[in-house]
Swiss-Prot record:
It comes from Proteus mirabilis (strain HI4320). Pfam families: DHQ_synthase (PF01761), DHQS_C (PF24621). The gene is aroB. It catalyses: 7-phospho-2-dehydro-3-deoxy-D-arabino-heptonate = 3-dehydroquinate + phosphate. InterPro entries: Dehydroquinate_synthase, DHQ_synth_AroB, DHQ_synth_fam, DHQS/DOIS_N, DHQS_C. One of its GO terms (cellular component) is cytoplasm. The keyword Zinc applies. This is 3-dehydroquinate synthase. Pathway: Metabolic intermediate biosynthesis; chorismate biosynthesis; chorismate from D-erythrose 4-phosphate and phosphoenolpyruvate: step 2/7.
Length: 364
């Protein structure tokens, strides 16, 4: 069992990583006998995990209710979040309740925002079941729902009480979802850790095959890196946490334009990271060889390295200008400056953005 702490003073919390955690009551601390919990999950995951988690909690005397939501990015909305509030109110959950997010990034983000909002804030626990949510979205307290005009535009910074990562969940993950998660894994190597990027180049086949030791190390390293960044810049005020958004400004444009769920989040981020690499290459801070290493690693992870055929370069910018990093009308982009290093830049022209996007339309 691995334990990592996200250090935020009185709001610090543990990340627990191991197999078989759903059968261990102590996994779900700080839940205690007599306390209420509302498990939020979706129709795909409920048959797989809901009974296991419910039984483990009920054996400890926890009072368990659940709400089962539809599955998909298109349901990460205020309308669906209202179903969570309805369930909480109908079951008379009060301020000492705990929401338990049992699912991937959509469930985690939506449940976290519901927890931040219900009766002005209740406790919640992240139980991520996808690789993407285990290595990224479950850690750090970013919670949100989507709006038709932009991804994650309505939300709050709200930290969980704990994060529980059961490695056994990956055995039921569809290959496309696994690859989507690997995009966020590769991101960490590009922006923060050259040695980890090299390790990924040498071990990507093991990750695709779900080799247990490789996967455990991979998830632990990603969580360590994310925890360090969140501890130093929780609310993205210094620019450090913004580095975690490599590829996301381009990627969110793809998701919004194509319709949420058509491209998985990691797929859109993968194409976006290539666009960011091409932009950095054009600026002379990333070599062609480094760009090719990124492209080849993404391809080995079965990820796209081009934007959608249906999108033209001019389709991206309106969505990109709604990005949360836009300030004073200027687009702020996270760009690599060598494998393992990155920076946030506000001096990128529209022409340079268009050039990078154009080079990623059926080009690689």
């Amino acid at each position: 069992m691995e334990k990592i702490t996200v250090t935020l003073g009185e709001r610090s919390y543990p990340i627990t990583i191991a197999s078989g955690l759903f059968h261990q009551p102590e996994t779900f601390l700080p839940l205690k006998k007599g306390q209420q919990v509302m498990i939020v999950t979706n129709v795909t995951l409920a048959p797989l995990y809901l009974d296991k988690v419910t039984n483990t909690l009920e054996q400890q005397g926890v009072l368990v209710d659940s709400v089962i939501l539809p599955d998909g990015e298109q349901y990460k909305s205020l309308t669906v979040m209202n179903d969570v509030f309805t369930a909480l109110l109908e079951k008379n959950h009060n301020r000492d309740t705990t929401l338990l997010a049992l699912g991937g990034g959509v469930i985690g983000d939506l449940t976290g925002f519901a927890a931040a909002s219900y009766q002005r804030g209740v406790r919640f626990i992240q139980v991520p079941t996808t690789l993407l949510s285990q290595v990224d979205s479950s850690v750090g307290g970013k919670t949100a729902v989507n709006h038709p005009l932009g991804k994650n535009m309505i939300g709050a910074f709200y930290q969980p009480a704990s994060v529980v990562i059961d490695l056994d969940c990956l055995a039921t993950l569809p290959p496309r979802e696994l690859s989507s998660g690997l995009a966020e894994v590769i991101k960490y190597g590009i922006i923060l850790d050259k040695d980890f990027f090299i390790w990924l180049e040498n071990n990507i086949d093991k990750l695709i095959a779900l080799e247990p030791k490789a996967m455990a190390y991979c998830i632990r390293r990603c969580c360590e890196l994310k925890a360090q960044v969140v501890a130093a810049d929780e609310k993205e005020t210094s620019g450090l946490r913004a580095l975690l958004n490599l590829g996301h400004t381009y990627g969110h444009a793809i998701e919004a334009h194509m319709g949420y769920g058509v491209w998985l989040h990691g797929e859109a981020v993968a194409a976006g990271m290539v666009m960011a690499a091409k932009t950095a290459q054009d600026l002379g801070q990333f070599t062609q060889a480094e760009t090719q290493r990124v492209i080849q690693l993404l391809k080995k992870a079965n990820l796209p390295v081009n934007g959608p055929d249906e999108m033209q370069p001019e389709d991206y910018l309106p969505h990109m200008m709604r990005d949360k990093k836009v300030s004073a009308g200027k687009l702020h982009l996270v760009l690599p400056k060598g494998i393992g290093q990155s920076e946030l830049r506000a001096d990128i022209s529209r022409e340079q953005v268009y050039k990078a996007i154009t080079s990623c339309i059926n080009a690689n």
